[in-house]
Structure formats: structure tokens, C-alpha cells
Curated annotation (Swiss-Prot):
Transmembrane segments annotated in the record for this chain: none
Role description: Involved in peptide bond synthesis. Stimulates efficient translation and peptide-bond synthesis on native or reconstituted 70S ribosomes in vitro. Probably functions indirectly by altering the affinity of the ribosome for aminoacyl-tRNA, thus increasing their reactivity as acceptors for peptidyl transferase.
Protein name, entry field: Elongation factor P
Entry keyword set: Cytoplasm, Elongation factor, Protein biosynthesis
CC annotations in GO: cytoplasm
Family per record: Belongs to the elongation factor P family.
């Protein structure tokens, strides 16, 4: 059993007797109130999606499924194809990846975990941090150096995030895949 706060994208939870892939989580905290976790879920069996809200301390069944370390091979619309160390290929529907699809690029070297339910590849969990190239960002604003200055940037794969003001187009940056936040320039 995990608390709602411990669940992250790529996990599979049992809800109302059906397995659901967690595609996105967003935790909000307010003054004296407990944390609230919003989750975007996709039903593995019915191919339907929903958004639901839990209290941070709510307990839920995190289904322990077979997981394999795989690397990304290619995209064959609408499937992402991953390969394990023994060269077996597994198709994962694009809809099951959620926000992770914005970080998947051709030639990526990071090892992902592909999750299986009843022999079918149902989700992919990215490593906690990945390194991507900034494909576009505005030039730094001169003289704007007070505090932590952030600006929008697009990275290879298509994800958009806020980066530090000193980051330029072409720089390699480290991204936390759980939150989609800029960590550092590499």
C-alpha cells in the first residue's frame, strides 16, 4: 500500500476493481490543510481516462506488476516501441505514456521501465532525471539578475519548461521527469 502522495506517473493502481495507469500527478498544499493529489488516470482494460482527486494520506493499492528495463527504439504511430537487453520488442500505446512522451527522443540512451499487465505492455516509467538539449529559448534579459529569474524553453522531444535565465539554445540541461522541472545545466 502506498499513500497518494507516493504515487508517481507510470505506477499502476487498483481503483474500483480495475487497474489504472497513473499518467500525471499534481500535488497542491494549502496553509493548514493536508496535501491534495490530483491524478490523471487511464483504465488499462477499458481504454478510458479520468481525472480524480485524493487526499495526500489516502492509501491505495499499487499493483506490483512485471517490469523490464528497456530502451526506446522507435515510434510507429500510435505505438512507441521499446527493446529489452535480449532484443525483444514491446509496443506501448502513445496514450499510455501521458506526459512522458514529451521526453522520449530518437537515440535516447536512458533506460526506462516498461510495465506489463497480463502480458501486455501498458506503461513506461522514465528515469527520475534525464538530460535533453534546449531547442529554443529566448535570449537572456540584460540587467534582470535579482532573485531566481526563469524563462520558458523547449527541449528536444517537445517538452516546455521553465529554465534559469542563463540557459541558452543548444545547452544540455537536466530535467526531473516527475515534476517536469529544470534541475541544472550539464
Amino acid at each position: 500500500m502506498k499513500t497518494a502522495h507516493e504515487i508517481r506517473p507510470g505506477n499502476v493502481i487498483m481503483l474500483d476493481g480495475s487497474p489504472w495507469v497513473v499518467q500525471k500527478t499534481e500535488t497542491t498544499r494549502s496553509g493548514r490543510n493536508a496535501a491534495i493529489v490530483k491524478m490523471k488516470l487511464k483504465n488499462v482494460l477499458l481504454d478510458s481516462s479520468t481525472e480524480t482527486t485524493f487526499k495526500g494520506e489516502d492509501k491505495m493499492d499499487d499493483i506490483i506488476l512485471e517490469r523490464l528495463d528497456c530502451t526506446y527504439s522507435y515510434f510507429a504511430d500510435p505505438m512507441y516501441v521499446f527493446m529489452d537487453a535480449e532484443y525483444n520488442q514491446y509496443d506501448v500505446e502513445a496514450g499510455n505514456l501521458g506526459d512522458a512522451s514529451a521526453y522520449i527522443v530518437d537515440g535516447m540512451e536512458e533506460v526506462c521501465q516498461v510495465t506489463f499487465y497480463e502480458g501486455k505492455a501498458i506503461s513506461v516509467e522514465l528515469p527520475t532525471t534525464i538530460v535533453r538539449e534546449v531547442t529554443y529559448t529566448e535570449p537572456s534579459a540584460r540587467g534582470d539578475t535579482s532573485g531566481k529569474v526563469m524563462k520558458p524553453a523547449t527541449v528536444s522531444g517537445g517538452a516546455t519548461l521553465s529554465v534559469a535565465d542563463f540557459v541558452k539554445t543548444g545547452d544540455m540541461i537536466e530535467i526531473d521527469t516527475r515534476t517536469g522541472e529544470f534541475k541544472k545545466r550539464v
